[in-house]
Amino acid sequence: MKKTLLHYLIFSCLLALVLVGFVYASSPIDKKQYMTVTVASGDTLWGLAKQYEPAHGLSPDEFIRWVVDVNRLPSSRLTAGEQIVIPVLKSKQDGSLAVKR
């Protein structure tokens, strides 16, 4: 009886942790915290990932996936003039981020 109760308790705790994880993972991010860039002619997500690499700490694939998901882009192709949010916190944009264009 005590073993069964212990198993139910452990199962309930694990289920609660999984549910909290799902809720946290599906929470929308606050785009206002992140940098917005205007896409220039010839820009690619791969190039932007490399350009801002010191500030975001993601692999190029993770960067691209983040940008496509957060901006709800239909593909990874960019259009000159469009504005996209990138995974660089505005707090990291303190003037120390030098970017070559």
Curated annotation (Swiss-Prot):
Transmembrane segments: none
Example GO BP: SOS response
Annotated GO CC locations: cytoplasm
Domain (LysM) ranges: 35-86
Superkingdom assignment: Bacteria
Keywords for the protein's UniProt record, in alphabetical order: Cell cycle, Cell division, Cytoplasm, DNA damage, DNA repair, Septation, SOS response
Localization: Cytoplasm
Chain's role: Inhibits cell division during the SOS response. Affects a later stage of the cell division protein assembly, after the assembly of the Z ring, by probably suppressing recruitment of FtsL and/or DivIC to the division machinery.
Family: Belongs to the YneA family.
NCBIfam families: PRK14125.1
UniProt protein name: Cell division suppressor protein YneA
Higher taxonomy: Bacteria, Bacillati, Bacillota, Bacilli, Bacillales
